[in-house]
Amino acid sequence: VERGKDVRTRKVDLANISRTQNVDPESNYCFGEGGAGAYSDGKLYTRSKKRGSIEGILNLFCQHGASPTILADAHPHIGTDKLPRVIENMRNRIIECGGEVRFETRMEELLVRNCRIEGVRTDKGEILASAVILATGHSAKDVYRWLHSHDIAIEAKGFAVGVRLEHPSELIDRI
């Protein structure tokens, strides 16, 4: 379940933000396939102490179209121009394996019976599932409010903000 749009359609919405200053609350820099990082600079970075298998994750990116150079780079970088295609390839592989992706679908609540998760209720109906993974990013305040109101423990995570500066190549060449 993804409240935003697919990574390609989302690109149109991001261009619209720049052109008209109108922000679609469900398809913007925070919401949509690939999350906040999909249209960042393409750097792969974690501050988490729970790092897991970084090599495994980098291999997964390579299997879906990232350059194998990220396996050896001290600071792996896929690039803004390539990352959306890698994300799209990952989604297509999930679908090939029998998974399903529902875009423009908002989770409204978890279905819990007898202290067990049984699925989710969305704005488009119920989806039953034996397991649910919430990968909300940092801006799904409605989800956090719902979890809090149902006494489900949540933990705050640090927030990082980056800045991207673009300069004409002539200026950079002079420097």
Tell me what each language-model feature is.
Residues 1-43, 47-175:
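Residues forming the flavin
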